[in-house]
Amino acid sequence: MILVTGGTGLVGSHLLYQICQSETKVRAIKRLQSNTEFVRQVFSYYTEKADALFQKIEWVDADLLNISELDFAFKGATKVYHCAAWISFNPKHKTKMMYTNIEGTTNVVNLCLAHHIQKLCHVSSVAAIGNTINSAPIDEKTPWVNSPINSCYALSKHRSEMEVWRGIHEGLNAVIICPAIIMGPGKWEKGSSMIFKQVWKGFSFYASGTNGFVDVRDVANVMIQPVSYTHLTLPTILLV
């Protein structure tokens, strides 16, 4: 059985659609107050059989910071996708975001080891690579450089990655996916998908600088491959 954390998020919902097309059993973790209707809506973007596919998901309420709840969700799982994370660039969220992202990943890694999970796919971010000198190109081998201009979010994702690497050194079979800014059909009123709504309304401004973008559907498709074929040993994959 496949277990997905962050199933009601942008990446998690599109990933669930990909998984539900197979005969594999799938369980998704959500917070108690999360609304799964968004996932059904995402499914409807793909197919008229959205309801039938949506019914294949076993939903479990669990907090990533609650070990007992998380341990229950892991029972019977063989492969895990860790998509859940708090995304914020507001300095006032730093302490809670750092704790949530890092400790949540620590718990996932520890339970993957305890439950002998065959493969973990951890969704990180290009932000986890940090800023390079003179905006030099980056790849999967670019080392992290401590810098005061690294965002709190970037630091939280970098340290979360360190927990996954710790798990790898302890014998966990894992892959880390590092997408750029993820775009695609989702919650039009929040997150990166807001840009579509703003442009539709006639937003006529743009910022200087450069960035990378990737379609959420491509992210979901790429995530399936290294988990389906557990013998693949690419520890980190950048998606831009």
Regions found by a protein language model. Give the residues of each.
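Glycine-rich phosphate-binding loop and adjoining beta1-alpha1-beta2 segment
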Residues: K30-A52
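NAD(P)-dependent short-chain dehydrogenase/reductase
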Residues: I168-F213
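Substrate-positioning beta->alpha
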Residues: R159, K190-G191, A207-P226
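Conserved Rossmann-fold NAD(P)-dependent oxidoreductase catalytic core, especially the SDR/UDP-sugar
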Residues: K94-T95, Y99-C152
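N-terminal Rossmann NAD(P)H-binding glycine-rich loop of SDR-like oxidoreductase domains
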Residues: I2-S22
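NAD(P)H-binding glycine-rich loop region in Rossmannoid oxidoreductase-like domains
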Residues: S44, A50-T100
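Conserved small/polar residues in nucleotide/adenosyl-binding loops
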Residues: T230-T236
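Active-site Tyr-X1-5-Lys
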Residues: N150-A174
